[in-house]
Amino acid sequence: MICLSFVLSYYFVVRFARDKMQRKFSMFFQSTAFEKCSFDCDLYGEIEFDPLIQSGFFKKHYAFYSDMQGSGEICGGVKFEFARLGVHDDINGGDFWGIFFHATLEKSVKQATFIVPNEIGFENKKCKKVAINDSEFNKIFSVFGGDTESVAQILTPKFIKRLMKFEKRLISLTDNKIYIFLNTGLGDFEPKFSKSVLRENPFLPLKREILHCLFITKILNSNL
């Protein structure tokens, strides 16, 4: 009995020490990586509820979990925020992970516009499906908006080219806001102190996705 108690005590002490070391390692690695990208980063920071609902991607009954929140500014005044996001549908069931990004543009779009992968059953009663004169783009994405003219202002060839590189993303534009959700399916970007971050760097996918979100935001900000 004493032996079992000792083993359990030893197990919990070791586990606590390991988890504490993991947190310190993650915080150091993430803060350093974000600093090089000129982002403000809070490893355990959460994103607010309102932007999630305002994006039009999620319903109010969904349960959200977010962390690894970051923020910054580009183009001399366009503020952005992102976070790792977990979503659970309390009614229909199902969980999915990804990255949620939103930014405030210098100008506003004429009408709300949604760009979503064809594999997603997207519905919005306020928007109609808009035909895009690009067969390759139409194979992957559907666009919902007000009219062809306002959508054409957004979907320039440069914008489409960048968007085509990453298929599993949802984009919505409302007023002067852009919202992007990347359905990466990755539930854990944190580096493991027991593994070499040179050979296995879990931050790189997150960094790559955020940089593409910023690039898309820059293109859109200049188009409006």
Model regions and ranges:
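Accessible peptide chain termini
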Residues: 1-2, 54
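Transmembrane alpha-helices and immediately adjacent membrane-cytoplasm interface residues
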Residues: 2-27
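Charged, low-complexity intrinsically disordered regions
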Residues: 31-224
